[in-house]
Amino acid sequence: MYTVFLAGGIASGKSSVARALERRGAWRIDLDQLSRAVLEPGSECVDEVAAAFGDDLVDTCTGALDRGALARRAFADAESTARLEAIELPYIRRMLVRMLEGEGCCQTNPCVCVVEVPLLDRMEPMLNLADEVLVVDCPLEVRRVRAQGRGMDVADFDRRAALQPSDEYLREHATTILDNSGGPSDLAARVDEWWASREAARWKEARNG
């Protein structure tokens, strides 16, 4: 199995690349979805979150977590955010490992898995699982304009961007960088070129040449 960790800042086009690779036959795993999955009713992660942030977050009848209330408490300050991540991340990482070691990817042809990683620095201990780290790169100013075009408030964009790994960090940890400073057709061409080059190499590990 050829595993790609796909990263990029907010409004960089990361999800567009993930969808494009999925259309070409890659098995797609979105870590945002995994972060929601580990907080399903009855999970150990929910128990730990409730112990840290308040039992009143959990519905006593359904066991469902009030995610909105959790967000308000956990993202109120950096210390609370770090506490939530310290609880969630081990569960997310274990779930990812189980999925990568399972048979899901083997049902695709070629046997390629793309893992959409919102915060690459939080997954740094697991970069050894990736054959390639593919980073979608786009200037902050361009991303800000794109986010505005989708209806996002500028202050909200800047707040979210500040919480993410820096562009310098992403470039430093990238095996390959996809430039997305142009339009959709430019990005599509770069994705096609990347896919074709990996097919030609028979999906050999890019990091080791």
PLM features: residue spans?
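Short, structured coil segments at secondary-structure junctions
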Residues: R24, F53, L129-A130, E172-A174
